[in-house]
Amino acid sequence: MRPNDRAADQVRPIKITRNYTAYAEGSVLVEFGNTKVLCNATVEESVPRWLKGQGKGWVTAEYGMLPRATHSRTRREAANGKQGGRTMEIQRLIARSLRAVVDLEAMGEFMITVDCDVIQADGGTRTASISGASVAMADAFQHLVDSGKLKANPMKGHVAAVSVGILGEDVLCDLEYVEDSAADTDMNVVMTEEGKMIEIQGTAEGEPFSHEQLLALLESAKKGISEIVAAQKAALAN
């Protein structure tokens, strides 16, 4: 039995709070159960040097965890003088996922940076970051439209992500930490709102998984992501 008696293919309760902070052009607190991530999207009227003069924009991301986001305190990466490999991998994943749903040429020479800060971690922090960042980015683009700097929102749709895994004989969706740490297979899936794949990260931690199990994992992820996209759209409609 899963925590909180969730069904195997059921995502955790999702809460998306927009305009969470006062200064960012897009600010979202996203909650998946006990996992909470603050996603702030900042607009800059400039692009990286290698893009200057091309009439294209750029979307990038940064990711971090507060020291007590987990059960025991983790030393700040700034205190260590460098980012860890996991952090760099995750923020690149977030950025790639966001760019996949943006028409960079239509956004002009603007850059959006989405900072994803994990306030509390209970599994699925990277997937929650992507799902929250999509909403924050949508608000940042709408800010550019409302201010007359863009004619239309250059987002082609929403992007969302979820973790899936195999625990025993069960395919589970949106794993909490206690499930993730015990899973035989752990997979992160990123999709567009149309169900097109952006990224699949899957590893057999214990027993190898079959082709049939892979398809079951992807089907579970697709269902979960459709629920997340519905929550994103509902949040933006308010």
From Swiss-Prot:
One of the Pfam families matching this protein, by short name: RNase_PH_C
GO-annotated biological processes: rRNA catabolic process; rRNA processing; tRNA processing
Coiled-coil ranges (or none): none
Catalyzed reactions: tRNA(n+1) + phosphate = tRNA(n) + a ribonucleoside 5'-diphosphate
Keyword tags: Nucleotidyltransferase, RNA-binding, rRNA processing, Transferase, tRNA processing, tRNA-binding
Family: Belongs to the RNase PH family.
Quaternary structure, from the entry: Homohexameric ring arranged as a trimer of dimers.
The name this protein goes by in its record: Ribonuclease PH
